[in-house]
Amino acid sequence: MNVTAVRPPRPDELILALETSCDDTCAAVVDGSGAIRSNVISSQGVHDRFGGVVPEIASREHLRVINTAVDDALSRAAATLDEIGLVAVTQGPGLVGALLVGLATAKALAAARGLPLAAVDHLQGHVAANYLAPERLEPPFLCLIASGGHTLLGSVGDHEDFTVLGRTVDDAAGEAFDKGARLLGLGYPGGAALERLAAEGDPGSFAFPGGGGRKGNASAFSRGLDFSFAGLKTALLYKVRDLGADEVTRRRSDLAAAYQAAIADALAMRVQRALLQTGADRLALGGGVAANGAVRERLRQLGVPVHVPPRELCTDNAAMIASAARFGPRLAYPGYLDIDAYATGERRP
């Protein structure tokens, strides 16, 4: 595949990175030392009225704005394409149509400028966001990635060594937040709205599987390191139906607080077990769910240092893709032309 190098870039080398795995069109410029020169995120509000991301619409929106995102990233970095030394792009996992927009753009830029290209795994990007934070973390550590599309627990041995210990068997944690918010009438995306509502409620008011209420009980899926949130979502659905519209309206904040605590406890159970099994003494977080304050606090109760990137680096962004590219292989033309996208649940080719 014509690998040109597997080495950290020079500190002054600029990396232009693209991320289009879902519904955010992202472009960033990061230098070889890990300093972020720019980090542009263009979110697609068009999906709100559908209650979720529509893949075809996401792809079309990426096509519409990706060139503008690249121009903005270069402008904010006070850089030109002539100064870029490496192009990086998310290869997967994600929505294939959306990923292909980023891949095609990255390949075209690299080919036109005679630059190498780094194809990055999206989940490795979330891990690598921890290498960009003001208090940069270095391996080894345990890492929990929790977002709308992924929930994964892994051991990070070095910058390119990520061993999966557990993953979701159904819904992701972020998806559970969004679906719970929809059941409580908070709209989409609902994770942040549910967190705000939960701050006004009592997490011990209701019992949910695996949850944090004082009436809660350990769920059947609490054994092992894999995650499951489908049962929790169904439990909230039945509770909402049983209470009726008026009672749900009156106790909506309590429902939100108990549901959020159950998600946080489900994550903490697996992390605690993984800490014991691996002997890890540090935990890093990645993904949009890492921005949730209740989740962060619950994980801090486990007694090990918890490293969390800034909120803008927790959600999907291209700076984290550039960060991962600093430590991975770069491909020369024409080898990278054969790179294809891979969907969520597929193995990397």
Mark where each language-model region is:
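Conserved phosphate-binding catalytic cores of ATP/NTP-utilizing and phosphoryl-transfer enzymes
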Residues: 2-13, 120-142, 324
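A contiguous, well-structured pocket-lining segment that forms one wall/lid of small-molecule binding clefts
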Residues: 196-283, 292-304, 329-332, 349
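Active-site neighborhood for divalent-cation/phosphate handling
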Residues: 96-98, 106, 111-137, 155-156
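N-terminal beta-alpha supersecondary unit
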Residues: 9-93, 122, 126
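Glycine-rich phosphate-binding/hydrolytic loop that grips phosphoryl groups
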Residues: 310-347
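Conserved phosphate-binding/catalytic loops in two-lobed NTP-binding clefts
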Residues: 119-120, 299-321
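Glycine-rich phosphate-binding loop plus the immediately following alpha-helix
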Residues: 135, 158-202, 233-234, 238-241
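Short beta-strand scaffold segments in enzyme catalytic cores
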Residues: 25-31, 143-145, 151-155
